[in-house]
Amino acid sequence: MNLELLESFGQNYPEEADGTLDCISMALTCTFNRWGTLLAVGCNDGRIVIWDFLTRGIAKIISAHIHPVCSLCWSRDGHKLVSASTDNIVSQWDVLSGDCDQRFRFPSPILKVQYHPRDQNKVLVCPMKSAPVMLTLSDSKHVVLPVDDDSDLNVVASFDRRGEYIYTGNAKGKILVLKTDSQDLVASFRVTTGTSNTTAIKSIEFARKGSCFLINTADRIIRVYDGREILTCGRDGEPEPMQKLQDLVNRTPWKKCCFSGDGEYIVAGSARQHALYIWEKSIGNLVKILHGTRGELLLDVAWHPVRPIIASISSGVVSIWAQNQVENWSAFAPDFKELDENVEYEERESEFDIEDEDKSEPEQTGADAAEDEEVDVTSVDPIAAFCSSDEELEDSKALLYLPIAPEVEDPEENPYGPPPDAVQTSLMDEGASSEKKRQSSADGSQPPKKKPKTTNIELQGVPNDEVHPLLGVKGDGKSKKKQAGRPKGSKGKEKDSPFKPKLYKGDRGLPLEGSAKGKVQAELSQPLTAGGAISELL
């Protein structure tokens, strides 16, 4: 469907479930590319599954990590993908080839990775129990961002919409606004509750359009701010949030929050159950609650950049939420007026005449001018939904879709193959060519596949024994404790299946005598064919 024809006056948020995406392995995190055509899903077995969101099919699978993937981010042009795993490794991938460009090893677990919105050479990394780090991919250098206090342990960070500033938040509710190029402090403020008590910052998310951003805090309140007001207040300012969003009834803590594609709605996923709360940003009222399967916990939420579609992850499965599409089979007149019933059209006088003698001279010249107007059919206008408010043109080198080639397996028998006498000569030729290939590979004429460069990032004062939150709590003995004795319910049985077939030994189990016994034994010693020994036995 053309994005220009999407209905923009009705409700622009999903209303019901619209199926699931099964990645075979357990899904942990997901993110859309800039156009919403591809969805990258990080899995528990270290693979990255890229879905074609238009066909709802798997377009590519990248065997990225050995440990679970905990964070993903697309580059601006869609050609690169950066991922982080629970073994403290950050990798950049080429989406088309699936190859790893480079790899970074950190001393502590990684909570979040994010590309610079306008410069894909820079990546923001949020390590656990450390200050945020900005990587420069071209020279493999890193810069540790300044924090408010050296005792800050859990610091979250995010680029703003254009990447000009970096917003950081710590466990004491302090927000710092740093200039991306120089890391200079531009503005700062503290998030407080009703009194002077502070609350920890859990995440910072920016809208794709406009200057608004939200802060998810530990007091279970989502605060929406205007970035322009933050910069105006300067250091140690006291800006007031535009909206405060919360669940007053259940006091629900929030696992993940994000804006809609147009920035008019905010969705928050509950940390207690698979439930999505949707608010309207302008007035702050709750417009919809989407309930998933009871008893499941939510892991991640992502809103489609263009359409009113939400992807959520729970129990390792990606759930899709969309609007209820009502089909309209009505008839329409040529002027797009909807018709309730068939109406016989009454032609006006001289309506379809080539030359209208009754028209006045001014009207005729106006019609001639309209007919002589040239229509441009070669230039392509940029789609406003894909462009930011400060851009005029689309990226011509963007990767919107992945080409898919069918995987053809070699058949056992080729009915269209060469005659038998030609097969022998071809086999001899193949043997000679294979020997040449071995010799050339031994000589080293074929270059091996280039291994990605691995860079160790050293951070001072960071403990090396931290455990990622996805894997559990540090010092948790439940996961390491082995069960003593026999497994529950075995009662001395074999470990294999009780329905294991027994082998035939001698004449045991054959209550036949004489010639019948010998005939059956002879038939059992031969392979069974359709209509052969079985039909004789019957």
UniProtKB/Swiss-Prot annotation:
Keywords: Chromatin regulator, Isopeptide bond, Nucleus, Phosphoprotein, Repeat, Transcription, Transcription regulation, Ubl conjugation, WD repeat. WD repeats lie at residues 22-63, 64-103, 148-188, 196-235, 249-291, 293-331. One of its GO terms (biological process) is response to estrogen. It holds the Pfam family WD40. Residues 371-380 are annotated as: Interaction with WDR5. Residues 479-490 have a biased composition (Basic residues). SUPFAM superfamilies: Nucleoporin domain. Residues 330-366 are annotated as: Interaction with ASH2L. It comes from the Eukaryota. Ubiquitously expressed. The modification Phosphoserine is found at S350, S388, S389, S497, S525. InterPro entries: RBBP5/Swd1, WD40/YVTN_repeat-like_dom_sf, WD40_rpt. There is a cross-link at K129 (Glycyl lysine isopeptide (Lys-Gly) (interchain with G-Cter in SUMO2)). It is found in: Nucleus. GO terms for molecular function: histone binding; transcription cis-regulatory region binding. The modification Phosphothreonine is found at T252. Residues 491-510 have a biased composition (Basic and acidic residues). Residues 344-360 have a biased composition (Acidic residues). Changing V375E: Significant reduction in its ability to stimulate KMT2A methyltransferase activity in association with WDR5 and ASH2L. GO terms for cellular component: histone methyltransferase complex; MLL1 complex; MLL1/2 complex; MLL3/4 complex; nucleolus; nucleoplasm; nucleus; Set1C/COMPASS complex. Component of the SET1 complex, at least composed of the catalytic subunit (SETD1A or SETD1B), WDR5, WDR82, RBBP5, ASH2L/ASH2, CXXC1/CFP1, HCFC1 and DPY30. Core component of several methyltransferase-containing complexes including MLL1/MLL, MLL2/3 (also named ASCOM complex) and MLL4/WBP7. This is Retinoblastoma-binding protein 5. It comes from Homo sapiens. The gene is RBBP5.
